[in-house]
Curated annotation (Swiss-Prot):
Signal peptide segment: none
UniProt protein name: UDP-N-acetylenolpyruvoylglucosamine reductase
InterPro entries attached to this UniProt entry: FAD-bd_PCMH, FAD-bd_PCMH-like_sf, FAD-bd_PCMH_sub1, FAD-bd_PCMH_sub2, MurB, MurB_C, MurB_C_sf, Oxid_FAD_bind_N
Source species: Chlamydia muridarum (strain MoPn / Nigg)
A Pfam family reported for this protein in Swiss-Prot or TrEMBL: FAD_binding_4
Length: 296
């Protein structure tokens, strides 16, 4: 069936290798993207193809099904960055967001210190508008380059894009994020701030276990982790999945967790909080085995 593609693909690739949860069955088809030209060819084909597909980066916000994904998984590994001016940088979407924040802050550039410790790619950070209480990806964003649903390469300015808390316009449209351009400032204290941020993350978050970071978006004015803690759910274990004792909004893989274990924990949290009149919205992307079921 791989001859259905005008480019090389792999078959039956385990997705647990491409998730920070270390959970997931095999992708029916798998393609690593390493250049913009290659991505343009792939999306030009997919525009006219019925084959379902998903795009992943570091897999740091995805829970894959135990059976895997019955379609094509595109792994974004497009690397590179260029300074357009003294304080403006264009970064390709497969670059590690955390590494970018660390490198820039160590060189005295401010604007992306908050990225240190966020385990996704630049593309994933734009897609989720990743951030902290201090800043988010859109804060320093100048423009985004995308390949649209028809396979066209477009550049969109920040002013054309509506971002909000953990939300970007790309969550509701079919587009591949190619690059992001960020506006930085010179600041000799940037490295010190980045160091303090990562130390705080290590102190408060369970980095010693596989996870995908925060499972739920914070409701307005309150921490989802604090609500889960107050509900007495920290430490709850189902199979190999556990609500972290360290941070209530983290579910960790203690060894052999399945997607079913994690989904049951998510459902338990939501049901418990709903009884208190609180509706928690998932931040993690649940990737179904059958693509026609949609992505929640």
């Amino acid at each position: 069936m791989t001859n259905a593609f005008p480019f090389s693909v792999q078959e039956s690739v385990p997705l647990n290798r491409f998730s920070t949860f270390r959970i997931g069955g095999p992708a029916r088809y798998f393609k690593e993207l390493v250049s913009v030209d290659e991505a343009l060819k792939v999306f030009s084909f997919l525009h006219t193809s019925p084959i379902p597909y998903i795009i992943i980066g570091k897999g740091s916000n995805c829970l894959f099904h135990d059976q895997g994904f019955n379609g094509l998984v595109l792994y974004n590994n497009i690397q590179g960055q260029t300074f357009l001016s003294d304080t403006q940088i264009k970064v390709l979407s497969g670059v590690s967001f955390s590494l970018l924040g660390r490198q820039l802050s160590s060189k005295g550039f401010s604007g992306l210190e908050f990225a240190v410790g966020i385990p996704g790619t630049v593309g994933g950070a734009v897609f989720m508008n990743a951030g902290t209480a201090l800043a988010n990806t859109a804060s320093s964003l100048v423009s985004v380059e995308i390949i649209d649903h028809a396979g066209n390469l477009l550049s969109l300015s920040r002013e054309e894009l509506l971002f909000s808390y953990r939300t970007s316009p790309f969550q509701k449209k079919t587009a591949f994020i190619v690059s992001a351009t960020f506006q930085l400032t010179r600041d000799s204290q940037a490295a010190q701030r980045a160091k303090a941020l990562i130390e705080e993350r290590i102190l408060k978050q369970p980095y010693e276990y596989p996870s995908v970071g925060c499972i739920f978006r914070n409701p307005e004015g309150v921490s989802a982790g604090a609500l889960i803690d107050q509900a007495g759910l920290k430490g709850l274990t189902i199979g190999g999945g556990q609500i972290s004792q360290k941070h209530g909004n983290f579910i960790i893989n203690t060894g052999n967790a399945s997607a079913a274990d994690v989904l049951e924990l998510i459902e338990t949290i939501q049901k418990t909080l709903k009884q208190q009149g609180i509706a928690l919205e998932k931040e993690v992307r649940i990737i179904p085995f059958q693509p026609n079921l949609g992505v929640s």
